[in-house]
Curated annotation (Swiss-Prot):
Its EC number is 6.3.2.-. It holds the Pfam family RimK. PROSITE patterns: ATP_GRASP (PS50975). Keywords: ATP-binding, Ligase, Magnesium, Manganese, Metal-binding, Nucleotide-binding, Protein biosynthesis. This is Probable alpha-L-glutamate ligase. NCBIfam families: PRK10446.1 (NF007764), rimK_fam (TIGR00768). Its cofactor is Mg(2+); Mn(2+). GO terms for biological process: protein modification process; SOS response; translation. It comes from Pseudomonas fluorescens (strain Pf0-1). The keyword Cell wall biogenesis/degradation does not apply. The keyword Ligase applies. Mn(2+) 1 binds at D248, E260. The lineage of its organism: Bacteria, Pseudomonadati, Pseudomonadota, Gammaproteobacteria, Pseudomonadales.
């Protein structure tokens, strides 16, 4: 197969590993800088151009689209889909999962466990919003944030009111969530490929920190997940319509709660922690499921 990898940086660990794994299995791997691809949309034959030449003959595309380029990245990926190129994750599923609020609304509709979450526009509704999520301590999240940036833990209702007012004053869209104390600053990253959780790791926040992101100094370790956690991760990825996803789960007193479904999960942490060839498993999934003109939309909403 001729496989495109949409990535801003060919030197990133995840991009490098996918290229290595694909090459090892006999595929032609081509890394394309997402922002340098441009499109002829209105022609009868949809095209993508790259560095002055049309991109042709691709069987599949692996999107590694960073959060900051979601809009343009999804447009490029959609154009590949219009050309009949099979996407590992489709554009509509990536857009769905990148919208934190929309993704929680869709997960909630399917009865998947979530932390109690509130969303409001008017400062007049702040006290009621805080009560809605069972009061302080609570977590405030900027909807556009990634890697733990724009996430604040407020220990008291007074602090929460001040922080929410400040974000609203800056015209930032935020959501307010209950703080799951019993998780102890840890979450579980379940790596889903197709209809299997192929690997899982526990991410523990460093002392004095509640965000467990590895980018914020968190540590990763092997973990055995429960059947309920496995089923929750698989259902969450399916609701989003994602074939490959990193599903972040908290262990709470009332079962597993989904924090986020990541459409472009990093490979370094999970491969290093588990010793599994995750990149190879992803390429195998493409071989089994991918092919020209197999671009039917998955997921709803």
């Amino acid at each position: 197969m001729k496989i495109a990898v949409l990535s801003r940086n060919p030197r990133l660990y995840s991009t490098r590993r996918l290229v290595e794994a694909g090459t090892e299995r006999g595929h032609e791997m081509v890394v394309i800088d997402t922002l340098r691809a441009y499109m002829n949309i209105a022609s009868h034959k949809p095209q993508i151009h790259y560095r002055g030449k049309p991109l042709e003959g691709f069987d599949a595309v692996i999107p590694r689209i960073g959060a900051s380029v979601t809009f343009y990245g999804c447009a490029v990926l959609r154009q590949f889909e219009m050309m009949g190129v099979f996407p590992l994750n489709e554009s509509v599923a990536i857009a769905r999962s990148r919208d934190k609020l929309r993704s929680l609304q869709l997960l909630s509709r399917r009865g998947i466990g979530l932390p109690v979450t509130g969303f409001a526009h008017s400062p007049d509704d702040i006290p009621d919003l805080i009560d809605m999520v069972n009061g302080a301590p609570l977590v405030i999240k900027v909807l556009e944030g990634t890697q733990g940036i724009g996430v604040v833990l407020c220990e008291t209702a007074t602090a929460a009111e001040s922080v929410i007012e400040a974000f609203m004053g800056l015209k930032q869209n935020i959501m307010v969530q209950e703080y799951i104390k019993e998780a102890g600053g840890a979450d579980i990253r379940c790596f889903v490929v197709g209809d299997k959780v192929i690997a899982a790791m526990k991410r523990q926040a460093k002392p004095g920190e509640f965000r467990s992101n590895l980018h914020r100094g968190g540590s990763a370790s092997l973990i055995k997940i429960t059947p309920e956690e496995r089923m929750t991760a698989l259902r969450a990825a399916k609701v989003m319509g994602l074939a490959v996803a990193g599903v972040d789960i908290l262990r709470s007193n009332h079962g597993p709660l989904v924090m986020e479904v990541n459409s472009s999960p990093g490979l370094e942490g999970i491969e290093t922690t588990t010793g599994k060839n995750v990149a190879g498993i992803i390429i195998e999934h493409l071989e089994k499921n991918g092919g020209p003109n197999m671009t039917r939309t998955k997921g709803k909403g």
